[in-house]
């Protein structure tokens, strides 16, 4: 038997679009997208909560356009698949309550005209009059473990969750219902290379009449085998499929949901650090969102350039101040150049002021709903600007 003393296990999870917290993320980002379609400069901080038969949308929105929020809510729930009362939640009959205010003028004055501009250090044209919408710290991460430069556990967890929804919506497994969760445990060797999958956990909501045996058989055939590389599975890989034995009551009927409660699912599955800020429902002046996207963009380009096998980038901001108060890079001993040199390259080639990020990544567009389920990073099914590696070549040349 192989020596496993220096091997380690790492686990990440994902959830399907029908999970209560993810319903809320998708509603918040659908509202954001509808507003940005007509008013790209809108300020949006939209929070959603769901429970049995009820959706509450609250927050601060300053915009020149009108959006029929209840219609957006119902359309989103319908597209997810909650279309019948027997699912415990129905897009046509659920109550939708809204409580929307405008952005605080105290915050707006800091965002509208950044501190450096007020002090005469920079022109409004340079900063486009946008300071950070809040203080805070954000992390971005990339490694060369997968083609999309993401850690393998979260990558596979997302793919399993997305495949669950495809099997349901495509009626490959018509007894599936929208709520579900996935989890993958990967074994790493002493060189930190992934060698095998130790455990796969899938819990999926289902029709009450289907047997656990059928669910187990079908998910192995139609979900796991279609997603997980065969060479990573061996006879010792463990499967836990609906381990409680029954998952009929789910969605908002089973658990209340809230925007921003799946921040680790949204990012790197716990493989990298997290600054604590959620993404969904926030316009790009909120650095919780745009700063995290920029940090991923930086980290991915550093790894794509071959300057490190792993790279974690931390950005930090002060409210109303455009320039980040700190930029920190950790390559975990895998860097081809010093971390200090990488910070210099980042300052030179990436504009990490909020207005600079918005311009660099073209963020004033309705592109956010598609990020609200199955992860904001490492996506190969949708085009996201922070996933581009267009800076890799110049970083490689100048390192």
Swiss-Prot record:
Cofactor descriptive note: Binds 2 divalent ions per subunit. Binds 1 potassium ion per subunit.
Amino acids binding ATP: 19, 179-181, 246-247, 255, 261-262, 278, 282
Cofactor entry: Mg(2+); K(+)
InterPro entries per the UniProt record, alphabetical: ADOMET_SYNTHASE_CS (IPR022631), S-AdoMet_synt_C (IPR022630), S-AdoMet_synt_central (IPR022629), S-AdoMet_synt_N (IPR022628), S-AdoMet_synthetase (IPR002133), S-AdoMet_synthetase_sfam (IPR022636)
Primary enzyme class: transferase
Keyword Cytoplasm part of the UniProt annotation: yes
Record Gene3D superfamilies: 3.30.300.10
Primary subcellular site in the record, as a coarse category: cytoplasm
Annotated catalysed reactions: L-methionine + ATP + H2O = S-adenosyl-L-methionine + phosphate + diphosphate
Transferase in keyword set: yes
Binding-site list for Mg(2+): 21
Region Flexible loop, residue ranges: 103-113
Entry EC number(s): 2.5.1.6
Binding-site list for L-methionine: 60, 103, 255, 286
GO molecular function terms listed in the Swiss-Prot or TrEMBL record: ATP binding; magnesium ion binding; methionine adenosyltransferase activity
Cellular location(s): Cytoplasm
Keywords: ATP-binding, Cytoplasm, Magnesium, Metal-binding, Nucleotide-binding, One-carbon metabolism, Potassium, Transferase
Entry binding sites for K(+): 47
Family classification: Belongs to the AdoMet synthase family.
UniProt-listed NCBIfam families: metK
Protein's recorded name: S-adenosylmethionine synthase
Source species: Halalkalibacterium halodurans (strain ATCC BAA-125 / DSM 18197 / FERM 7344 / JCM 9153 / C-125)
